[in-house]
Amino acid sequence: MENLSILEQAAKSTSKPSPDAVVAALLEAEKNARKNKIRYSFEQLIGNWQLCFITGTKKTRQKAGIVLGAGRYIPQWIAKIQITYAAEPVAEGEENSETGRVENSVQVGAIVLTLSGPTKFLVNKNILAFDFTRITVKLLGKTVYQGFIRGGEAREAEF
């Protein structure tokens, strides 16, 4: 349970644990979830999440060399990165379908870039699948561009 307190401190405290301690806590939490076959639901993910720490895969870290290291905090004065999961509206009397929408927003100064698209929680695999199909660019709070990306309209219909 110490790993959970390290992760909570990394997310909420001004005195942050070392990046190595956070990576070790993340790996331990992941190992524990697999060992205990912890199952999640889409409902547990719904809401706004702020990204405050990043890691790469071992392969990515090897490619990046010492520049990336094992993990890094994202300074809030550089960028604010937020991801939002929302459930699709369900008609009265219908069962929740484990589908919804995702929005990933990156704010740097007065510019906000948002990628969004459909999500589907694959219960048997305990995985959230998603596809970014739309982009919105805002400058000083005003939308300057909004549209589908990479054949997004067709991909969204197929999802």
Model-based region annotation:
Residues E2-F159:
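Soluble ligand-binding/transfer domains with enclosed cavities or grooves
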